From Swiss-Prot:
It comes from the Bacteria. This is Large ribosomal subunit protein uL10. Forms part of the ribosomal stalk, playing a central role in the interaction of the ribosome with GTP-bound translation factors. It comes from Thermosipho africanus (strain TCF52B). PROSITE patterns: RIBOSOMAL_L10 (PS01109). Part of the ribosomal stalk of the 50S ribosomal subunit. The N-terminus interacts with L11 and the large rRNA to form the base of the stalk. The C-terminus forms an elongated spine to which L12 dimers bind in a sequential fashion forming a multimeric L10(L12)X complex.
Length: 180
């Protein structure tokens, strides 16, 4: 059992973590054993190294830490009923973390169940977790942008090189005609 001072320190530490997190996902871990939670954490580490954490946190501690971090906890009070585990991402792609926990939940037949999440400070309901898990990762989005920009540039290069080739052919034809 934690003393009041320890709880206050924990709230302070968690509020700092939540301030720096791009993703805070709330889930009900009921039905998962320690080995399964460890497996989920391992999968998160494989994708995001130490940038993501999945922790079982007491409801009152999570509530106070989020409130201290500046989140509007009154709008999400139903999140703080029942068992609570929080996935937060301080460093790395939050969409990748959502994909990992969503795939794990599908694999475990809906466990852990989702209660909602904050993504870059905006709250999304539990129903939207599936849609967010289908979004491309930051790396994929950057690749799409690069290929989108690269296409017209390649076209311009091809047009210019084609024009230069045609000019070269014309000059060669003139040279051949004059040499005859």
């Amino acid at each position: 059992m934690l003393t009041r001072a320890q709880k206050e320190q924990l709230v302070k530490e968690l509020s700092e973590v939540f301030k720096n997190s791009s993703l805070i996902l709330f889930s009900d871990y009921k039905g998962l054993n320690v080995a399964q939670i460890t497996d989920l954490r391992k999968k998160l580490r494989e994708k995001l190294a130490d940038g993501a954490r999945y922790k079982v946190i007491k409801n009152s501690v999570a509530y106070l830490a989020l409130k201290e971090a500046g989140y509007n906890v009154e709008e999400i009070e139903d999140v703080f009923s029942g068992p609570l585990a929080i996935l937060y991402v301080e460093d790395g792609d939050p969409i990748e973390a959502i994909k990992v926990i969503y795939d794990f939940s599908k694999e475990m037949k809906g466990i852990p169940s989702f209660k909602g999440l904050y993504l870059d400070g905006k709250f999304f309901s539990a129903d939207e977790v599936e849609n967010l898990s289908k979004l491309p990762s930051k790396e994929q989005l950057l690749a799409m942008v690069v290929s989108g920009v690269q296409g017209p540039i390649r076209g311009l290069v091809n047009v210019l090189s084609g024009t230069l080739k045609n000019l070269l052919y014309a000059l060669n034809a003139i040279k051949d005609k004059k040499s005859e």
